Amino acid sequence: TTSSVQYENDDVMRPVWGDDYSICCCVSATQTGKEMQFFGARANLAKCLLYAINGGKDEKYKTKDGKPMQAGPEYAPITSEYLDYDEVMHKYDLMMDWLAGIYVNILNLIQYMHDKYYYEAAEMALIDTDVRRTFATGIAGFSHVVDSLSAIKYAKVKVVRDENGMATSFVTEGDFPRYGNDDDRADDIAVWLLKTFLKKVKKYHTYRNSEPTTSILTITSNVVYGKATGALPDGRAAFTPFAPGATPSYGAEQNGLLASLNSVAKLPYEYALDGISNTETIAPGALGHSEDERKNNLVHVLDGYFDQGAHHLNVNVFGLDKLKDAMEHPEKPEYANFTIRVSGYAVKFIDLTREQQLDVIARTCHEAM
């Protein structure tokens, strides 16, 4: 089964990490015995976009008197009926500056306290004394930010506000290019977002002079981050799961598997050395009629994807009906060891929470190449 393994590109990792590297965490490479990583969760760039629109006020959390909480810097909110791309980008850039600063500062505190109270002396004794340290950061809500900015740029996005003047939802008028369709108009925004946030993170001092890196990898926390984030201009409903990692948003991919892979392959690995996790679900029939034909076609798909410089791919080959049946009838013997790739790791489907199972079912299942 393809879901029991993940595929990573040695051609992009070997020049960075050398011949003797290992995969740690989920998809991240590391020089074996020579380095360690300060792990750092993710920054919710989708929520950051809403902060830019709402002047740093939180769309979910309230003060004791029921007013929106001023969680970010008190910048002037956007008050126009329709979102202007240049205005949004200016405010978003400022809000990302603030987020990168507070993100790195908090991670510095966490790593300092971890070393103070739970230093991993036994593990460090097995590593070279001249240790290379990387400072891991990450991005959550990636595809939704890309599609939201694309909607603002190429369509008309009307803001729906509540009695407090908070943007609570958006009405998009017209079509716009979405990440995951091999359309450079959207994919260029994706590349910009990745490069920009890492550059902002690198402006700040990191604990023990570690090297800042980033990832587009959320594991199953895409569900948790989504729970805290309101509606977005790309059409994602409030407090629903994000697409995981660098995977395009659910339903955004309209041109088949290859177009989706081509979009993700444009993300430069050197700007996300902790990993660019991509999880794709493919209906068996999309790969061919016979088992041999499917294997052969999948090999060609992987070769084409990785030849473009892509970093990582999880492949699930099954139909959605099987997932739905497994969710409703977990007692069936055939599902006891039914394993899927969620994001950076493999798990038995019946061991996921129902909320996580529904998230997996909601993902795009490619019916065509």
Task: Give short role names for the model-derived ranges.
Residues 1-369:
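Conserved catalytic cores of very large enzyme subunits
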